[in-house]
């Protein structure tokens, strides 16, 4: 069998639980030692706490530094208010026209009914019955349309609310995720070759997770700000950012025993 016929075995990254368990800490403790970090402490727990503190700080500061939702300036606020007033005026005008049309129609009908009351009583009764039916059907259609509009609006609002809740749950787990080791692992120089494979996987995994949480925090901040402003389609505005956050969770490097030497 030639060398080219030998399949290249791929080494999957170690399964690292997001739970704060002894195995996870033990894995990272092998590489997070005082001589590998700039923190002036020899206590292992203090060292780990410092790593977690800086990881949390990076995530929190990212929301302020990289918010993609631009604040409304005075001109935009004025234009938004002007647009709302114009829409309100248009709606009032349409309502007034509708009421006037209904009144004119009623007056005309009353006049005709009075004139033909004596010899067209049966026809009038039939007309009244038809009008009543049409009015009832119109009310039903209006109610149905209103329910549909409210449902659509609620679904749009719910999508944003669901996204905010889901994103918060991702960030709530950050205190026990491998991202808390990233600030220390950034300073670790992993050995080259197969001997350093575990170290490089742990390092890349923790850094990718931290970058992901930074991204999710930016995403959450933008959704909340958008919702607080009362803007529409908040979820749709940041779909691309959501996709970026999902992609950031995956370490860029894929590992195999044969390419680890050139890593």
UniProtKB/Swiss-Prot annotation:
Coiled coil: 72-168
Highest taxon in the source lineage: Eukaryota
Chain intervals with Basic residues compositional bias: 83-95, 108-121
UniProt biased composition (Basic and acidic residues): 96-107, 122-131, 139-158
Keywords: Coiled coil
Keyword field contains Translocase: no
Region feature Disordered, mapped onto this chain: 76-158
The keyword ATP-binding belongs to this UniProt entry's keyword annotation: no
UniProt name for this protein: Uncharacterized protein DDB_G0288629
Organism per entry: Dictyostelium discoideum
């Amino acid at each position: 069998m030639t060398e080219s016929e030998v399949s290249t075995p791929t080494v999957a990254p170690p399964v690292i639980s997001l739970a704060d368990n002894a195995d996870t800490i033990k894995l990272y403790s092998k590489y997070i030692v005082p001589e590998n970090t700039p923190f002036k402490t020899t206590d292992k727990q203090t060292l780990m706490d410092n790593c977690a503190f800086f990881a949390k700080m990076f995530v929190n500061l990212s929301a302020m530094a990289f918010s993609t939702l631009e604040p409304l300036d005075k001109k935009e606020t004025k234009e938004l208010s002007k647009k709302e007033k114009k829409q309100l005026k248009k709606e009032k005008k349409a309502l007034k026209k509708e009421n006037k049309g209904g009144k004119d129609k009623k007056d005309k009908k009353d006049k005709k009914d009075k004139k033909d009351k004596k010899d067209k009583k049966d026809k009038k009764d039939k007309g009244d019955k038809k009008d009543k039916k049409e009015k009832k059907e119109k009310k039903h259609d209006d109610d149905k349309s209103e329910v549909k509009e409210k449902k659509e609006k609620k679904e749009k609002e719910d999508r944003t609310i669901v996204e905010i809740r889901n994103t918060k749950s991702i960030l709530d787990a950050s205190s026990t995720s491998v991202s808390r080791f990233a600030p220390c692992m950034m300073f670790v120089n992993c050995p080259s070759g197969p001997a350093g494979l575990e170290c490089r996987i742990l390092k890349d995994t923790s850094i990718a997770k931290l970058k992901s949480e930074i991204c999710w925090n930016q995403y959450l901040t933008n959704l909340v700000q958008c919702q607080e402003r009362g803007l529409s389609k908040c979820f749709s505005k940041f779909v691309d950012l959501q996709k970026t956050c999902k992609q950031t969770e995956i370490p860029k490097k894929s590992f195999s025993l044969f390419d680890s030497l050139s890593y």
